[in-house]
A protein has these predicted regions:
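Noncatalytic, beta-rich nucleic-acid-contacting surfaces in large DNA/RNA-processing enzymes
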Residues: 1-397
């Protein structure tokens, strides 16, 4: 409306008046009612298509880019890594000998544990299909949960793994990470004490790197590295006063302990999803993996278990609350009616690990679970308490 007079004046200068001018204005006005939303939809669709193409063909590079851009977006680094791992991307822990400041790609031939400063054979076989680069593509088939995953056929960076950066470690900021990398490029680190001395680490920073497995490259287990963290020279000790004490024979960490250590140090478990360690016990109780649900389960009542990644209650949803539940097989949308949420609100909000009972809804390739009961995962499986305590969620955003 603010431009109406100016528009009519301009049209009059070009001989467009009366009914013709009114018709042009009416059409512009009608388009304005949805043109803003349409332009946003088109620009967003382009971003979605480009992102989807990259995720399919270069999932390793796509993951590394997302990790470099943190904090951002809907999904946590843990969920991003878990999804990439399910699609065949190898994710490696921080390594003081090879990690950069941020997450990056490295050749699969660079094997962990080679020793500080060493590198493996650098050979990357070409991957993917040339037809993927053609402008004209066949129609995409309808998605069905549980159908064979053929994404590996399209992957073009299959010879690369994602290496977590040093900034992913708790307490290691960008300035310190840059100093660690700069010192390493000047001269490879000889041992753990050399890293601490040259990079100027505190005991807390050394312990965080040890917990993350960053010193594994020196042939140390995580417990040995943690023991050594209290003896090496650091900013917390007087120069030359550290005791050169060999660590005692310490038992290695179990797979569960390694996962918990990863989560504490980086909030990411690159090896295994935390719920995978509980799968046997869950199956004994008839609790199914979320990735096993699909069209054949439509309307069935089932129980699933996992870690809550999101809680949302949109103002336009009529009181319905939505949760995302994740286990080692994938994510599941949980739909909670207003009465159900009121009944289980305390458990639903306070427990990051849940066992959820409900009925499956399957439509257009999307599986939802309409929940009718919550139980804390730690109450059903007490051994899960430490895992649940390490998990976090993003709520009501």
């Amino acid at each position: 409306e603010r431009l109406k007079a100016k528009l009519y004046a301009g049209m009059a200068m070009h001989g467009i008046t009366e009914e013709v001018a009114d018709e042009i204005y009416a059409r512009i006005q009608a388009f304005a009612s949805f043109g803003f939303a349409e332009s946003h939809a088109i620009s967003f669709a382009l971003l979605v298509y480009a992102s989807s193409w990259l995720k399919l063909h270069y999932p390793g590079a796509f993951l590394a880019g997302l990790l470099r851009a943190q904090p951002m977006g809907f999904y946590s680094p843990q969920s991003l890594v878990a999804d990439a791992r399910r699609h065949g991307v190898e994710v490696r822990r921080p390594d003081i000998a090879v990690s950069g400041v941020d997450a990056d790609l490295e050749q699969l031939a660079v094997v962990e544990g080679l020793g500080a400063g060493e590198s493996g054979a650098a050979v990357i076989a070409p991957g993917g299909m040339d037809s993927c680069r053609a402008a004209d593509q066949p129609k995409v088939e309808r998605f069905r949960r549980g159908s064979p995953d053929r994404s590996a056929e399209h992957r073009r960076d299959g010879g690369a793994a994602v290496r977590l950066g040093l900034t992913s470690v708790n307490g290691i900021g960008r300035t310190l990470a840059e100093r660690i990398v700069a010192e390493r490029e000047r001269q490879p680190y000889a041992d753990m004490n050399d890293v601490v001395r040259r990079a100027g680490l505190t005991v807390a920073q050394t312990e965080a790197l040890a917990t993350a497995g960053a010193f594994d490259t020196f042939g140390l287990s995580r417990r040995q590295a943690l023991w050594n963290a209290g003896y090496v020279d650091s900013l917390d000790t007087l120069p030359g006063t550290a005791v050169d004490a060999a660590p005692p024979e310490l038992p290695g960490m179990s797979d569960v302990e390694l996962t918990l250590a990863d989560l504490w140090a980086t909030k990411i478990s690159p090896g295994e999803h935390p719920i995978s360690h509980l799968r046997g016990a869950l199956e004994e109780q008839g609790i199914r993996p979320v990735g096993s649900l699909g069209e054949p389960d439509d309307t069935r009542r089932v129980r699933v278990a996992g870690l809550v990644t999101h809680r949302q209650r949109p103002g336009t949803a009529g009181g319905v609350t939505f949760l995302n539940l994740e286990d080692e097989t994938g994510m599941l949308n949980i739909v909670c009616s207003e009465p159900m949420w009121k009944r289980y609100r305390r458990i639903g909000r306070q427990s990051n690990g849940l066992v959820i009972r409900g009925r499956v809804e399957y439509a257009d390739g999307v599986t939802n679970l309409v929940a009718d009961r919550f139980d804390p995962l730690a109450a059903v499986l007490p051994q899960s308490a430490a895992t649940v305590a390490r998990s976090t969620s993003r709520d009501f955003h």
